[in-house]
Amino acid sequence: MDSWNMKGSKMVDVNEITKYLPGFNCGACGYKRCDLFAEALLNKDVKLEDCPFLLRERFKENYEKLKEILKIKGKIKKEEKYIGVIDGYEADFLLKPLPNECSCRETLLIMDKKELKVGDYIRYRPLGCPIPHFAKIIDEYHGFYIIHVVGPSHRITGEKIEYKDVGIAIVVAFEGIVEGKVPEVGKTVKFIPKHCMMQKVHSGVVVQVEGKRVYIEGIDLKVF
């Protein structure tokens, strides 16, 4: 669906351009991904013809559509800024849960020797965070636990759930959907998990990207 500003003028953003590109992320245009090429098109740093696939018969309609879109001048949609509430730092993007999930997936290193299994509910405090968390274990992998944060909202609803207290845990990874510009693999990024109670900026290194789905390791709350 096309976007319009308050005066009825058409808005153009990276997503509108990207959906008409071939989507091969082949790098032939000089950019690693099609969305990066789309951004360069909007900034007029490249030409459509720099993508060799757009010149093929298969993508003829896409090529013509993109030419029409790129005729719109001076209406490029500005990227939204994501600012942490606690420290006021600017994040690169907001990290949202995977479809039909209640929170981003987090991978924990739990030092407590309690016997834990998938389906258990745990109470813990992430290293460096002053707020106790409540979570459900959804998977286990080589001594790491993948969880969904589910509380402390249960204290408001009055829901009675038995939790195992495991003390301090180290958050080693996040997985979720990017709202904003998708980062490249290997980049150090600053992000805000949408479910974070403090809305604090986190940092980490992107190790996997699939569309807008990203996996980030080396999580740290110290951001400069």
Swiss-Prot record:
Needed cofactors: [4Fe-4S] cluster
List the protein's name: Uncharacterized protein MJ0119
Record PANTHER family: ACETYL-COA DECARBONYLASE_SYNTHASE COMPLEX SUBUNIT GAMMA (PTHR36214:SF3), PTHR36214
Q: Which domain of life is it from?
A: Archaea
Cite a single Pfam family from the UniProt record: FeS
* Amino-acid positions noted as binding [4Fe-4S] cluster in the UniProt annotation, renumbered to this chain: 26, 29, 34, 51
| GO function term, MF aspect, one | metal ion binding
Keywords, in A-Z order: 4Fe-4S, Iron, Iron-sulfur, Metal-binding
Q: Which residues form the 4Fe-4S domain?
A: 9-68
Entry's cofactor comment:
Binds 1 [4Fe-4S] cluster.
